[in-house]
Amino acid sequence: MADFIQLKKDNILKIGIKDIEGNDTGEHLEFDMEDIELPLRLNECEARHRKNLEFLKMQFVIIDKKEDKKGKFILSWKEEEKLKILQEFYKREMEALDLFLGQNGTNKLLNGRKPYYSMYEDINDMLVPILPKLKLKADDIANKIKEKYSNKATEKNVLE
């Protein structure tokens, strides 16, 4: 019989996800509150969101400067191109959000809904209640590190 070891799962924040009617979906997001990279990933998520918005605006300007043509079917060439750019924008937004939410976290929150323009802001609004917890944990971790190593430094000085 093999022996096993397992790390403690302290300070894991689990957030359940509900559908539009308020029913529990059984899905949840997990955040390791002692992960020092979590606030950094949140910052990177915000930076990517801003880059994505800039990308979308620039692409729309480029498309608008070109002459419109008749499309293959109902939509004009410009309309088709703008929709393709929007699809790319949504893909980039989901990748940015997944940096913080974890793999497929955005899909869990969308709960079957397709990505949409204000998705980032809506998800950000949902996460506002946990953001102070992240800051407190980041400060707490920094204080624990200071405390741990400052005590060793003073003990070392006392022993000398």
Positions of PLM-derived features:
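Charged low-complexity stretches with an acidic bias
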Residues: 17-20, 24, 68-77, 88
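Ordered, amphipathic secondary-structure segments that act as subunit-interaction surfaces
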Residues: 85-88, 101
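Mixed-charge, low-complexity intrinsically disordered segments
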Residues: 45-84
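Short leucine-rich amphipathic alpha-helices used at interfaces
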Residues: 76-78, 83-85, 126-128, 133-134
